[in-house]
A protein has these predicted regions:
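Membrane-integral, polyisoprenol-dependent glycosyltransferases
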Residues: 1-291, 379-408
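Juxtamembrane membrane-water interface segments that cap and precede transmembrane helices
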Residues: 357-391
Length: 408
């Protein structure tokens, strides 16, 4: 195989067929996830936070407090949805996921279907992105389809696609970001192949090659990673990893094309623009997700002191009071996640991180005891039933897939 042919690897010819297969699997995933998604008609697990935050963001522009969580949850089920106070809630996750939940609530109302609908949509889109990513990496539509089917039926992905939490949105944006980085790899290699055809050489003859500063897929990746970080902070670890991988792929492509020792310049000449596309764009996207907060923070109870004297006078002079207030708020969030409060919290159903990779203890989403016979499907005779919703993934699939990828 020639250098140009190796660089051109990945130009698949079944694009139309692959999209039909992708659409069919994604449709099945959507139908499975949307069926009876309003059950149970109550706020389960951490839905006690995010759907209520989303609802007040629609009406107040920020996350407001609900004075009695248990009473508020019961009231919401009965259709009483306005018992929040003007006081702002101290939230510990960025707003993107909550705005997406709010979209479903705006369309369908503040009910269990409304606050879960966006999760259904993004859980289905996650299947779509997984199919396309697996197809690109494997150069096989069949492998992509298998990946999509497996994710469609994975218990953890399925449950997370049917409750109003943030994780499914984060997962979608991360997979979309990784997919864009992989697309940039192919795009760059194909441009190098086109360049070699244009100059009429089978390789670069130790020349660095074209700069190719415009990288549309890297721009998309930066936006996706910014939205992922705007959902949950730990997305930044994936951003950092894929940034490094992306630059290494550029170096590898130039080396394959015949740049020789000049390929090492890729870490500077391709690396600096990559930093801008991925990190700077992600940061700007992340800041944009806080736009509503920057407008409303002076009206929040915890922000009233910020409406007067600046929280950080020195920083305020440099970036302005709104951004200085946002920085101070981020410092408080970081302290919450890493401080003594979180370190000392306990839970009767807590699981040790060492068991997460094998799901030693499934994630308990909801449990109802004492269901009487002939009610809610209970067929017990002379006894009662227990109904449990658990987010249980497929560790055997995860680990065998990882081993197979390593041995490929």
């Amino acid at each position: 195989m020639s250098t140009i042919e190796r660089l051109d690897d990945g130009r698949m010819t079944d694009e139309y067929t692959s999209w039909i297969i992708t659409a069919l699997i994604t449709t099945v995933a959507f139908l499975l996830r949307v069926w009876n998604v309003g059950f149970p008609n109550s706020l389960v697990f951490d839905e006690t936070y995010y759907p209520k935050d989303a609802w007040t963001m629609l009406h107040q522009g920020y996350e407001a407090t609900w004075p009695d969580a248990a009473k508020a949850n019961a009231d919401i089920v009965r259709g009483i949805t306005n018992t929040w106070t003007p006081d702002a809630e101290f939230v510990v996750h960025p707003p993107v996921g909550k705005w997406l939940i709010a979209t479903g609530e705006q369309l369908f109302g503040f009910n269990s279907f409304g606050w879960r609908f966006s999760s259904v949509v993004f859980g289905s889109l996650l299947v779509l992105m997984t199919i396309r990513l697996a197809r690109r990496l494997s150069r096989s539509t069949m492998v992509g389809a298998i990946a999509g089917i497996l994710l469609t039926l994975d218990g953890l992905a399925f449950v997370m696609s049917r409750i109003g939490l943030l994780d499914i949105f984060q997962a979608f944006f991360l997979v979309a970001g990784v997919s864009a980085v992989a697309a940039n790899r192919d795009w760059f290699r194909h441009r190098l192949a086109d360049h070699l055809r244009t100059i009429g050489n089978p390789h670069l003859d130790a020349d660095f090659g074209p700069a190719l500063g415009w990288r549309p897929w890297r721009l998309v990746a930066g936006i996706m990673f910014g939205l992922a970080c705007g959902t949950k902070w730990n997305s930044m670890f994936v951003l950092a990893t894929m940034g490094i991988v992306s630059v290494i792929w550029d170096w590898s492509a130039r080396r394959l094309a015949g740049a020789g020792t000049k390929a090492w310049w890729s870490f500077l000449r391709d690396g600096v623009p990559a930093f801008v596309y991925l990190v700077v764009v992600a940061l700007l996207t992340y800041l944009a997700t806080w736009a509503k907060w920057l407008v409303t923070y002076p009206h929040m109870v915890f922000g009233k002191s910020w409406a007067g004297p600046a929280p950080s006078p020195g920083l305020s002079k440099v970036v302005g009071k709104p951004l200085a207030a946002l920085w101070e708020y981020h410092r408080q969030i970081y302290d919450f996640h890493t401080g003594s409060y979180m370190m000392t919290q306990t839970h009767v159903y807590a699981s040790n991180p060492s068991g997460w990779l094998v799901i030693q203890r499934p994630l308990g989403v909801d449990a109802v005891n004492g269901i009487k016979p002939s009610q809610q499907g209970c067929k017990a005779v002379g006894d009662t039933c227990l109904r449990v919703i658990s987010a249980t993934g497929t560790p055997v699939l995860w680990w065998f897939a990882a081993i197979a990828w390593w041995l490929r």
